[in-house]
């Protein structure tokens, strides 16, 4: 086992694996990932793995859009097949006017980021 390395990533969940992946894509080779059990066997394994573009600021929308595109790219690699399906759609409910204002803000921001987001009222459901 190595006793020295440039980067140690602790945890083999989605965050740790993603960090290691992106470091290697940037050309880093002296990196090690440490996981106490099997990769993705903790919280990541229990996740429903729902990835949406929804986020209340441009940074989060951009990060989520990048993730969706990355998972699609990874699923197309015949050497490392993963089972990935990205469906279109979702439902979020507003119980207060404050929540509704948040959704209106997101809808306005989403239009500028090429993310489809539609607000419907109770009668349209």
Positions of PLM-derived features:
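Short N-terminal amphipathic alpha-helix/helix-capping patch enriched in small hydrophobics
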Residues: 16-19, 47, 67
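Short glycine/proline-centered loop/turn elements that form peptide/ligand docking sites
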Residues: 40
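N-terminal Rossmann-like FAD-binding beta1-loop-alpha1 element of flavoenzymes
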Residues: 5-33
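Short, flexible hinge/linker loops that cap or flank conserved catalytic cores
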Residues: 1-2, 25, 85
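Dinucleotide-binding Rossmann-like beta1-alpha1 core, especially the glycine-rich loop
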Residues: 49-124
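Glycine-rich, phosphate-binding/catalytic loops in enzymes
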Residues: 26-27, 48-50
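Conserved catalytic-core motifs of eukaryotic protein kinase domains, centered on the activation segment
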Residues: 43-45
